[in-house]
Amino acid sequence: MSEICSIVKGEPLCCTERLKERVEYGFASDLMSDVLTIKSVNFLLITGLTNIQLLRTAEMADAPYILLCRGKKATEEMLRLAEENNILILRTKFSLFRSAGLLYSNGLKALY
């Protein structure tokens, strides 16, 4: 995760101990109903959404890592819930398209 953070020039917002972990797959979406269809665990969710539903969806979908794009800011409630569920949140100024492209070209695999 620390390499992913570097690639997108990201900033960790919580659960920084998870930066030592590795993730093999990523999924980019602003549509949380699509995220809930995923049958995988341990993936990076790349999104531009910043609401509490994002954290609820990540928890249900077993996505322990979130990348917020376009410089979006997490609310205090989001950060509290992320800490409670041990979900690492990163933030980047890059767009969702650019972030996903950079990560894919650097070896992050697509779920499908």
Spans of features found by a protein language model:
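Feature captures the catalytic cores and cofactor-binding loops of soluble hydro-lyases/lyases
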Residues: K20-L44, G48-Y112
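Short secondary-structure junctions
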Residues: G10-T16, A110
